[in-house]
Amino acid sequence: MVLISKRTLLRASAAAAAWGAAGAARAQEIPPHERALHEAARREGELTWYTGQYNAETSEAVGRAFTERYPGVRVNVVRSTSQVAFQRLSQDNRAGVPQCDVFASTDFGHYSLLKRENRLLQYRPENDAQLIPALRGSDPDGYYHTSFMGLYLMAYNTTKVSEAEAPKKWTDVLEPRWRDQLAVGHPGFSGAVGIWAVQMRKMYGWDYFTRLERNRPQIGRSSMDPVTGLNAGERSVGIAVPSATTLLSAQRGNPLRIIYPEEGVLATLSPQAIPRNAPHPNAAKLFMEYTATTAFSTVIRTLFNDPINPAVDPPPGSRPMSEVKLIYPTQAEAERGVPEVRELWRDTFGI
C-alpha cells in the first residue's frame, strides 16, 4: 500500500476542474491502443481478478462495466481480504496452476516481494497518464500501478450512540465506557487494518492495543466487517472502517455516521499488478488500462469510492479534502511494520 499526502490530494482536486466535461466525453471513447488490446483480449475471452481493495459489490460492478465497455471479455471477480488473496496467489504458484490475471491488494509489501521474486509482468499502461498526477508511476520499473485510493476512519450506529457521545479521537475508544461496543478488522487478513495498526503504534505505541483489548472489541477480518456489525446493532462504534463502504451503507438507510478523528484520517493508495504467469495477459493489460479511465472512476464513485481519475468528482457525503487532516506511515514503515503488528496483534488479542 502506498500512502498519499493531503497536499497531493488538494492538487488532485484542483486538477479535476481543468478536465471538466471533456473528460466525461473521453470516457465514452475507446482509443486505438485499447481497441488493439481488446481484439487480443477477445481471443482470450476472460480474465480473473484477485482483489482485496474494493468491496464485493463494487468489484462486481467494475467487472460488469468492463465487459460492457469491452464486449467478449468476461471478468471473473475473486473478492477476499488482501492477505487471503495473496495466499491464494501463492498457492496457485506452488501448485503450478496459474489462475490470476490481475492481482490487487492493499498491502504494499506483497508487490515488493512479488517483484523481488520476479513474479510480475512488466507493463506500463498508456492510460496511467490519465490518473491524478501523484498516483502515476507507482513503480518506476512498471511492474505495478495505482488502482485504489481509500480513507479509513471511524463510524457509529446513530440509534445506539448520540453525536455528542460519539468518539472524536482514535484514543477515545480506549475509554472503559466503550467496553463490548467496538468492532475492528484484523491485520492478519486486511492490508488496510495492518496499515492502520502501524500508524496507531507509531503515534501511541503498542500500549494503544493493550488498552483496546481491555474493551473486548469484536474482531472481524476485513476492514468492512465492522460496518456489517454496526448495521446489525451488534456493536456501536467501528474502528478503521472504509469511508466508501460506510457512506454507501448509510445512503441505503442504515443508521450510520462517519467520524473524522481529530488526529487525522488514514489515507492510502494501493496498486495492482499482472502475474508473470497470467493465463490471459492481453485481457489483463486491457484491465490495467481500464482502471485508469474516467469510465472506471465513474463506476466506483457510484458506490461511494474515491475516484483515481481527476475528471470524476468525489462521492457525495464526503468532506472536501481541504477539510480533512490525513495521517499515514511511510512506505518503508508500512512494509516493515505490517508483519510486526500481525504478530503483536495475535499475542495481544489471542486471535
PLM region descriptions:
Residues 2, 8-27:
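N-terminal export signals
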Residues 31-42, 47-48, 52-72, 154:
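Short, polar/charged alpha-helical segment
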Residues 50-63, 75-90, 98-234:
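Extracytoplasmic ligand-binding site segments that recognize negatively charged/polar headgroups
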Residues 109-113, 236-255:
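A ligand-binding cleft/hinge motif common to bilobed small-molecule-binding domains
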Residues 120-129, 142-145, 171, 248-266, ...:
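Short beta-strand->loop
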Residues 150, 178-188, 210-213, 219-220, 252-278, 290-314, ...:
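Periplasmic-binding protein-like
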Residues 153-160, 197-198, 268-280, 299-300:
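A bilobed periplasmic-binding-protein/Venus flytrap-type ligand-binding module shared by bacterial periplasmic
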